Amino acid sequence: MSSSDLTGNFYKEFFIQNSTENATDAIKISLNQVDSYNRFNKGREIYIYLKGLFLVEVKSGDGVYTIGGNTKDGEVETLTSNRYPSHIFRSASTEMIIPKSVSILESKDIGIFVTFDKLEFPISSVGQPFVDPADDYDSHKTVQRCSGFSYYNFILETSSFASFKNEVLIDGGGSISGIVSKTYNGSELVLVLNTTEDVELNSSRCTLSDSNEFSVIFEDDFESYPNNLSITGVWNNFIEAGSKEWKIKTTTDSQNQGSKIAQIGAYNSGDSSNVAWLISPPINLDSQSIEFINFQSSNSFSDNSNLELLISTDWNATNSGIISATWSALPGIIVSDSESYQNWIDSSYIDLSAYSGTAFIAFKYTGGGTNNSGTFEIDNFQVITQN
């Protein structure tokens, strides 16, 4: 159990995750039962008898997969109070759930108990209650995290029925832990508290970096490349599976109209799988004290295709060594499927100070088949360092 309705911030639902620490998957259970914490408390190991149940999204297309008792119009319905005792069983074991450390909200973490550091509420919100008295159901409060030269903002969602709704947002910086979820209409990721004990803002507020103290050591806006051709030159353009590779295109998107961009997509490929890499030139992380990367991304024909931002410090710069190298995920913001195809999303400034040696940054696209053929686009890739 990663969530609890002890404080009333969850209603007739709970989330379970696949591990007490470093969880990678979670799922929602929808049941017609309030105060379920009396039997299914946070950290409780439970078993679910799946026969006769349904696994669908809460709202069609929202990505919040839920076990329920029935479906209607492609969406889940709750497991009734008469049925759930025959399907959900608790064990005698209750474990401590160690929150997964993250720096951005991502769909892959929905239902997982996560923690953010370097968080604070905007000064304008300090002293306000968690729930605005004018809100009937849920209140949204902005939380901000220092991310290089700007703030990464996301929403903390609180139910108007939560027992702590009248507690006020405090000043200071620190950590906040909660469950990654989505708004009622499924349009936006949010963080939801189990309890305000998981709000630990006991330190000073964070400080943004000064852009005047940094300079660019590598950048590429892709304007110098020939249009409609494969990307070559300093980038490594590698096809792991399928036939599609990264190419230069000129975008017509209103937010970036006329710019040349790096584009990948599996549409009309005819391949069951497409995996394509675009890997940066080497970055010497030992020549400077602090490095950040930044870029913008957009998409088209949003579906279940995927774009990952990765880093390696042991790749040998050969195509044959790409798969065997160690690649770690970086916490950059990549455009979501729900975003309009006209929009370009900033990655925020991604800190590379945890790495040393010679690093390579990779964009790895995975798609293919009839349901995973979406297009991703990258522009204005930049590596900066402190002077």
Report each predicted region and the residues it spans.
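Beta-strand acidic-aromatic groove motif in beta-rich domains, primarily in extracellular
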Residues: 9-14, 58-62, 290-294, 303-312
